[in-house]
Amino acid sequence: MTDWTPKENFMAVLGGEIPQSVPRYNMGMKTMNGRETTRGVGPSILRKMDSHMSPKGGKDIWGVSYVANEETGFASIPEPNNFILDDITKWRDIVKAPEIDLDIDWEAMAKKDMEDAEIDRNVTAVYSSAMLMPFQQLVAFMGFSEGLCALYEEPEEVKALLNYMTDFYVPIIEKTIEYYKPDCYYMLDDTASRYSTFFSKEIYQDIFRPIYDRLAAPANERGLPIGFHNCGRCETFLDEMVGFGVKWWDPAQHDNDLLGIKEKYGRDLVITGGWEVQLMPSWPDVSDDEVRQTVYDTVDKLAPGGGYMFIGGILVRPGDEKAAHLHKLVQETASEYCDHYYEKH
């Protein structure tokens, strides 16, 4: 039998089918030597205006300063105690949408951006993104304390701010989908800790759901499957997410009732993840066999019946040879075990 490509397995599971292999999701990053399940693309005109994902930190397109360090694998966060907005009612004086010429040659830009990305579209699915993380952007402007207070004290001002940013992004999202022709669409917003959501379902429905609806609309109107990245115990919000078109959810951390979620949604919501180092109580004093077993156990728990993709790894600090070894071990074990899983089980 011919081996399915990562893209074929990925698109099959999003379509509610049983794939040949359990897809190994990579969140769009170039990490699998050209055999990635997904890769993200987007207009370079925005990337040139945004430096906040740099290993040295920088500013996002809204003027928020970010910092990064080696302990986080150079993942960036808003610079502590350097927030640009301390009063949500004053956002109109502070937050200014960048000026972008929507009449640029989108076809030429898309052609060059796709060539630069070096993606084999027969092997790898391409996604475009929503570009805006509404809650995360709010706390990037204000910090967690002030941002959460604003949700309760000035909900109409928060709505106005989020709609202002959405007004900026939606035309760009529509142009991106039109010219880059992605296979799917990706949204992100972390709204929970490992213990609970940061705010109530009522606030989600009142403030955030209308924004997510607007951000999802360009994909839904074109029939693109939607993924959503939401860390933590966010199961309270899954009905809403499915309601605006989400087909896969990552990283599906084990603090959620994953088996209950799988039973409730079946293949309509693809659980993507379920593995993390907290599964090993003795971490980091673990053997290779223990690490391998956690991968086997996670896949065997969540893959039967379809509706599942594996994602797992260890954030590696530069110079930490043990963490690097274990991260590689997780990837190799998952690759071997997920390959042709549904033919072997």
Task: Label each residue range with its predicted role.
Residues 38, 44-46, 67, 77, ...:
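Intrinsically disordered, low-complexity, compositionally biased regions/tails
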Residues 29-30, 41, 84-86, 245-246:
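Short, charged/polar low-complexity linear motifs in solvent-exposed/disordered segments
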Residues 42-59:
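Short acidic, Pro/Gly- and aromatic-enriched capping/linker segments at domain boundaries
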Residues 1-29, 68, 94-345:
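Active-site loop segments of alpha/beta catalytic cores
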Residues 55-103, 119-127:
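A contiguous, low-structure linker/loop signature
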Residues 24-46:
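Short, basic/low-complexity N-terminal boundary segments at the transition from targeting/disordered tails
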Residues 32-38, 55, 62, 76-79, ...:
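Short, solvent-exposed polar/charged micro-motifs at secondary-structure junctions
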